[in-house]
């Protein structure tokens, strides 16, 4: 995440009436374990430890379970694994869920890699597509 820019990212969504309804990280660090083996098993299923297919499928389930209307993806330049397959995974999620996808760049280790203007433009475009999809459905 772009921790130094949480105000900018949350304002960009709030000002457009967009709610963030799910996150992939919620279950990554919120688990209980009693033994070291249980801890290891839990950590082997966090987002950064699984392959593209499992990552995609977890996200598709989250999108469908929460009736997601659009996907906003942060490409974290400090996380090489995710930066490498994030675009393909996002494309597959968009197709499987029939939702628009927008991505923006950032870097948890170097905040200079975040552009508020890029973020705002991407969120604006995503919002326009989501609104057009709603209008086409008569909502």
Give, region by region, the residue ranges found by the protein language model:
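Intrinsically disordered or highly flexible coil/loop and linker segments, enriched in small
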Residues: 5, 68, 72, 132-136
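Peripheral docking tails and interdomain loops at the edges
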Residues: 87-139
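Acidic-and-aromatic substrate-binding clefts and catalytic sites of carbohydrate-active enzymes
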Residues: 50-53, 79-83, 110-113
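Redox- and metal-dependent alpha/beta enzyme cores, enriched for Fe-S-associated oxidoreductases
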Residues: 1-60, 64
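Active-site proximal loops enriched in glycine and acidic residues that flank catalytic Cys/His/Asp
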Residues: 22-25, 75-77, 105-108
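C-terminal hydrophobic structural anchor segments
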Residues: 56-97, 102
């Amino acid at each position: 995440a772009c921790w130094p820019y949480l105000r900018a990212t949350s304002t960009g969504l709030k000002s457009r009436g967009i709610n963030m309804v799910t996150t992939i990280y919620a279950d990554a660090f919120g688990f209980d374990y009693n033994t070291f083996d249980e801890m290891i098993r839990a950590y082997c299923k966090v987002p950064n430890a699984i392959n593209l297919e499992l990552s995609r499928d977890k996200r598709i389930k989250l999108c469908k379970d929460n009736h997601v209307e659009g996907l906003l993806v942060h490409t974290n330049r400090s996380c090489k694994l995710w930066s490498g397959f994030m675009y393909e995974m996002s494309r597959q999620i968009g197709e499987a869920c029939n939702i628009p996808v927008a991505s923006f760049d950032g870097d948890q280790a170097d905040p200079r890699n975040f552009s508020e203007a890029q973020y705002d433009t991407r969120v604006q475009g995503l919002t326009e597509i989501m609104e057009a999809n709603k209008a086409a459905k008569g909502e």
